[in-house]
Amino acid sequence: MKKSNMFKIEEMNLYKTTDRFLNNYKHLKKSLKRAPTLEEISDIDQLHYNGIEAVNEAILKTKIKENNIVLDIGSGIGGPARYLANKTNSIIYAVELQKSLNDIASELTHNYKLEKNIFHINADILKYNFNKIKFNNIVSWLALYHIPERSKLLKILYNLLEDKGYMYAEDFYLKKNITYDEKKLLAKNFHANHLVSLKTYKEELKN
C-alpha cells in the first residue's frame, strides 16, 4: 500500500519564514512615516493572485454587503478579511490552520482597529464547531486545494451556508494528468492535498 501524500502544512516552503510579513509591514510603516492604508499593505497581506482586485471580485459576485456574516477559509495573515470588513462593514470569521499566520493576522487586525468585525480562529475547518452560525457568504483564496476529504469539506460548507447564500473560491485545478511522483512533490512542497481536473472540480461542487 502506498503511503499518504499528505504532509504537515507547516512543512510548506511558502511559510517557513512567517516573520517576514511583520518585518515587511514595519518597514513599510517606517518608510511612509505613518500606518499604511489597507490598500498600501495589500502587497504584503494578500497571499493570492491579483490582491484586492480578487477580493473586490468576490464582493461583487457574492453580493457581500453591510452586516453580512462571511466565512473566510484559509485566511492567512488576514488581508482579505480586513479589506472585506473595512469596505463592506461585514462580519468575518477568518479561519486559519497555521497558528503563526493566525497570530500575525490578529496583530494586524488589532492595529487597524477591526476586531469588532473580524474573528480570527486558529482551527481546522473540517473539525471546528461554529455553534449553528450560518453564513451569507463563504470565500477562499488559494486554500481549498490544501484541504483533504473534499466531500466532507463541501458537506460542511453546504450546511454552513444560508439558503440563497454565495460561495467564492479561487483555487487550483489540473489541466492534465500528473504522475504519482509529481503529486507527491506537490503535496510536500505546497501541501496540495486535492488536485483534480476542472470537470471533476465542478462535478464535486454539484454533488
Range-by-range predicted roles:
Residues 128-138:
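A short acidic, Gly/Pro-enriched loop at the edge of an enzyme's catalytic core
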Residues 69-73, 77-127:
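Class I SAM-dependent methyltransferase SAM/SAH-binding core
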